[in-house]
Amino acid sequence: KADNVRVFELGRVFFPDETVGDSETTVKGVRQPLHVAGLVYGDAHEDCWAEAKRPVDFFDVKGDVENLVAPLKATFEAATHPAMHPGRCARVIVNGKAVGFVGELHPKVCRVYELPKPPVVFELEVAPLCELDVPSARAVSKFQPVHRDISVTVPNDVTCAQLQDAVARIRRTKPEAMIIESLDLFDVYRPEASAEKSMAFRLTLSTQGSEAIGEKDAEAAFVAVEQAFADLGATLRK
């Protein structure tokens, strides 16, 4: 048995679909979308003095999927799939459309094949990943970005994606939030037997204007983010 495996496959899958007719590229009654699938098993990286040895996990392959669909942005939501672990599986969404799944192989399948560690697998539909807009150049700001860390306490059922989506909405609708460049999660703490968790984000502000971001502008953007978080039940940690 191989200790470490990295494999992928690109090919067509077949579904019955009576809306499909005969043509030079199709067969009546059969839909044949192109899919890409991959499997990672074993250690997360080769032996290295700078890295502790550990098995590959869900988040390693989630990162691979994000790199695969770039420059499009993938989001993930908890899901179930008959071939995947019921608690370690996510639906992959690109441009608002579900394009596939990523997750650990189901424990029952691992037992059948006597695998001591669970492989992490993914499968994606290819066509939506090719729907790219023509990129447009963006001027580089003359000023350094402003960073501010935000720590909040949120109910356990509130996800990072929900909070980031809320901030994306206010960027489009509130003038004071348009200087927000990104909101990145860098820490999560879940106390035992608690209905809440703590999440820490780094807020980055940037402007293409002729003036640097002032303290009042930064504070207004921060308050807008705080209000967006509050709508989801998040409270600012003092």
Predicted features, each with a name:
Residues 2-11, 17, 24-25, 31-32, ...:
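A carboxyl-terminal module marker
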